[in-house]
Amino acid sequence: ILVMIEGKAEINAAGQKWGILGDRMDVFEKKPPHSIYVPNGQKWSLNAKTDCVVAVCSAPGKSGHPARKIEPNGIKLIKRGSGSNTRYIHNIAMEDEDYCDSLLVTEVFTPDGYWSSYPSHRHDEDDFPNITYLEETYYHRINPKNGFGMQRIYHCLLYTSPSPRDQLQ
C-alpha cells in the first residue's frame, strides 16, 4: 500500500495510471491521505510533482486482489481510547477490506504528552476479532520538530520469568 504522507505525486501501479495524488502538504494537517493498494509482485512507479513523502507499506499477502485507489473521502478521523490514551486514527486499510489479508495501515495522531499503542497488544495469532496475525511497523513524525517520542517493544516470552533481563543475555 502506497500512502501519500505529504505532497503530490503521479503514481502508476499494476499496469494502471492512477494520476496525480496527494492533497496535503503537511501530515499534521490531519487530512486523510490518498493511497493505492498494489497487489503482491506488481510493479509501481512514482513521479513527485512537489516535495513529497510516501510510505511504502508491505507484507507477504495472499494474491488475487486487484489494485485499487483508497480514497481520502472514505477515511474518517476517529477518536480511539480515553484519558491520556486518547489518540486520533485514520483507518487506511483495515480487516473489513478483503485485500487486507496480512497488512493493516493506519495513521495515528497522538496529542502531546499522551500514549499510543496502549494497552500492550500483539499480532502473533490468527483469532479475529480477538487477535490478528500480521506485521506491525511504526513510522514516527514529531511536531514540533524539537519534540521527542518514546516507544517500547516487548515480547511476551521475556516476561514469563521473574527477571526479563536474564532472558535477553
Regions found by a protein language model. Name each.
Residues I1, V108-F128:
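Conserved short histidine dyad/triad with adjacent acidic residue
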Residues H34, L104-T106, E136:
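A generic structural signal for short beta-strands and their flanking turns/coil linkers
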Residues A55-D112:
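Surface-exposed beta-loop interaction hotspot
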Residues V27-G64:
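Ligand-binding loop in jelly-roll beta-barrel domains
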Residues Q169:
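Nucleotide/phosphate-binding catalytic cleft detector across ATP-hydrolyzing
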Residues L2-Q42:
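Long, hydrophobic/aromatic-enriched structural stretches that serve as scaffold segments
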Residues Y159-D166:
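Conserved small/polar residues in nucleotide/adenosyl-binding loops
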Residues L2-E10, V108-T110, N130-H155:
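Short, conserved beta-strand element in jelly-roll/cupin
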